[in-house]
């Protein structure tokens, strides 16, 4: 698999274009500020009078309403929540985007599942940093970059891949390395990772571990430290050098326990559940579920958010984190700024 770096990208391509970033959330604020700092002519497109409008203005960026900003753009990057993109594309982007312009996304969901059907005269690309927007921005400011994916869905100009690489470079991606994929692969693997491992799997594993200890009479504080707080220490070791690096760094007792108990907890039944999750993603069943959830104003998700917020692990966690001010000092998320 080829990895692209700074030397493989022509930054002048994106610097010669007017770029409109639709949205100023987690990814939007990072892309807009990074491209602006790289010398790209950037306009942020958001609803006038909203919090995002004020935040983008405060960051020194040019801000316009969506339809107006799209009309003058050579490249339009849509960085809105997946559920909001189809309507915004249909009502404000498609009628206004110039013929022969480039339409860009950071996730393939809507194109892959036909919620957005791009006009045939457009280049359609994806530039997807493999990290949250706050990290995309902080790594750029540090002089580095978050590894990114690029993909081409439509190549009307014959230069879509070069444009994607140039955009990725301006966003810092070619500092970390850029890998080419396609919309199908990015969408399906991204959803699977989120659902089975990173969010769904990890959250349920942590909560179940916490509940098992507290139900057996152990102090909630001890359960929090052992099942949530220390997870970062282990994940950082794996992130740094893989599973073998983590095992090299932990005690023999911890490593032996991993081999004895790990396969009992995450077992053949877990593998079958993962395969079922992947099948839902591949067939489009999950996409239909998510789209329908949005159409009914997210009743299931709202209920689950409330239950999670009320879980004892949240209560004890807040108290313990207050004892560790260095965590807040290094926080990735500042809700007042992004």
Swiss-Prot record:
Residues noted as binding Mg(2+) 1 in the record, renumbered to the chain: 190, 194
Known cofactor(s): Mg(2+)
Chain sites annotated for binding substrate: 251
Physiological role: Involved in the biosynthesis of branched-chain amino acids (BCAA). Catalyzes an alkyl-migration followed by a ketol-acid reduction of (S)-2-acetolactate (S2AL) to yield (R)-2,3-dihydroxy-isovalerate. In the isomerase reaction, S2AL is rearranged via a Mg-dependent methyl migration to produce 3-hydroxy-3-methyl-2-ketobutyrate (HMKB). In the reductase reaction, this 2-ketoacid undergoes a metal-dependent reduction by NADPH to yield (R)-2,3-dihydroxy-isovalerate.
Similarity remark: Belongs to the ketol-acid reductoisomerase family.
Pathway(s) the chain acts in: Amino-acid biosynthesis; L-isoleucine biosynthesis; L-isoleucine from 2-oxobutanoate: step 2/4; Amino-acid biosynthesis; L-valine biosynthesis; L-valine from pyruvate: step 2/4
Keyword NADP part of the UniProt annotation: yes
Binding positions for Mg(2+) 2 per the UniProt entry: 190, 226, 230
The keyword Zinc-finger belongs to this UniProt entry's keyword annotation: no
Domain KARI N-terminal Rossmann: 1-181
Keyword annotations from UniProtKB, A to Z: Amino-acid biosynthesis, Branched-chain amino acid biosynthesis, Magnesium, Metal-binding, NADP, Oxidoreductase
Protein name as annotated: Ketol-acid reductoisomerase (NADP(+))
Record-listed NADP(+) binding positions: 24-27, 47, 52, 133
Positions annotated as active site in the UniProt record: 107
Domain KARI C-terminal knotted as annotated: residue spans: 182-327
Record GO biological process: isoleucine biosynthetic process; L-valine biosynthetic process
Any one cellular-component term (Gene Ontology): cytosol
PANTHER family given in the database record: KETOL-ACID REDUCTOISOMERASE, MITOCHONDRIAL (PTHR21371:SF1)
Enzyme Commission code(s) on record: 1.1.1.86
Cofactor binding note of this UniProt entry: Binds 2 magnesium ions per subunit.
Superkingdom: Bacteria
Molecular function GO terms recorded: ketol-acid reductoisomerase activity; magnesium ion binding; NADP binding
Catalytic activity: (2R)-2,3-dihydroxy-3-methylbutanoate + NADP(+) = (2S)-2-acetolactate + NADPH + H(+); (2R,3R)-2,3-dihydroxy-3-methylpentanoate + NADP(+) = (S)-2-ethyl-2-hydroxy-3-oxobutanoate + NADPH + H(+)
Pfam assignment, any one: KARI_N
